[in-house]
């Protein structure tokens, strides 16, 4: 297994050296850089990534593409703001709806139609009249997360109720995740849109993700024009990771800690090249 891992990493590093193209790293946050926890507010990046990310931005482009709000990401990655970098470093929140530099000085937001935001508020009102006491309601500003990690048995009735409501509230979509349903405006961008845009700046990319929201990126990087110059790494939880993700990645790790070791190994090979 380690031989196979080294072979894949070495092939990517050697190809990067041969063509002389710049390399960028793109990471999801929850489940990728940070272990999944029962309460979203308690999620924190694995400590192994602190020195790794410092090392990355000293030599490579870095992007964090997450479903989290940009304010949350700015807080999590503020330790990088004091480090000078000559490379592109950008945070993308709400799947790319908003983005920022590390200092929060240049926050940009895409336009969400007012009608969709009104429907989102109507969904909130309908939720208040429902009785799912086991569900933690997360207000993310331009989307809502309905977390049922404490009661996985209600996934089916909760999902059915959300689908029923969204059938009446045209302009909203449901995004399933690990023990969560996210309700968002239909015009909210997806991660693959953001990554596709980033690839126009950084031709060779290492992407790591763990959930349904990352599936589009894994599929994108499988396309012929990307597969030879990109490396996709899945962080898999055997009980929660969708099968489709395992079928579309180049490498699979079992935890954020293991991912950190793989990235460290890859950085060593890239530095040699």
Can you describe what each PLM-predicted range is?
Residues 1-6, 20, 185, 192-273:
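Mg2+-dependent phosphoryl-transfer enzymes with acidic/Ser/Thr/Gly-rich catalytic loops
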Residues 1-29, 33-38, 48, 55, ...:
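Non-catalytic pre-domain segments flanking phosphatase-related domains
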Residues 14-17, 78-85, 222-228:
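Alpha-helix termini
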Residues 25-27, 91, 206-208:
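Residue-level marker for buried hydrophobic side chains located in beta-strands
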Residues 36, 44-137:
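Active-site phosphate-binding/coordination module
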Residues 61-63, 90, 145, 206, ...:
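A structural signal for isolated positions on well-ordered beta-strands in alpha/beta enzyme cores
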Residues 81-98, 168, 245-260:
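Structural recognition of alpha->loop->beta junctions
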Residues 130-221, 228-230:
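Conserved acidic, metal-coordinating active-site core of Asp-based
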């Amino acid at each position: 297994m380690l031989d196979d891992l080294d072979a894949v990493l070495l092939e990517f590093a050697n190809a990067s050296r041969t063509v002389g193209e710049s390399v960028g790293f793109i990471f999801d946050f929850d489940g990728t850089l940070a272990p999944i926890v029962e309460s979203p507010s308690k999620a924190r990046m694995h400590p192994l990534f602190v020195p790794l990310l410092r090392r990355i931005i000293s030599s490579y482009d870095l992007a964090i593409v997450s479903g989290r709000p940009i304010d949350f990401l700015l807080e999590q990655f503020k330790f990088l703001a004091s480090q000078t970098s000559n490379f592109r470093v950008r945070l993308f929140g709400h799947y790319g709806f908003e983005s920022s530099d590390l200092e929060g000085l240049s926050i940009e937001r895409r336009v969400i139609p007012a009608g969709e935001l009104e429907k989102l508020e109507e969904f909130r009102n309908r939720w208040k009249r429902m009785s799912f006491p086991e569900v933690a309601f997360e207000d993310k500003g331009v989307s809502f997360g309905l977390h049922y990690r404490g009661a996985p048995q209600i996934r089916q009735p909760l999902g059915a109720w959300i689908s029923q409501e969204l059938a009446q509230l045209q302009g909203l979509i449901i995004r399933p995740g690990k023990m969560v349903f996210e309700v968002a405006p239909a015009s909210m961008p997806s991660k693959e849109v953001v990554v596709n845009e980033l690839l126009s700046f950084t031709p060779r990319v290492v992407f790591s993700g763990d959930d349904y929201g990352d599936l589009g990126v894994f599929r994108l990087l499988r396309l012929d024009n990307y597969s030879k110059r990109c490396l996709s790494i899945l962080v898999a939880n055997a009980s929660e990771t969708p099968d489709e993700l395992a079928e579309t990645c180049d490498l699979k790790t079992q935890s954020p800690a293991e991912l950190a070791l793989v990235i460290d190994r890859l950085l060593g090979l890239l530095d040699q090249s």
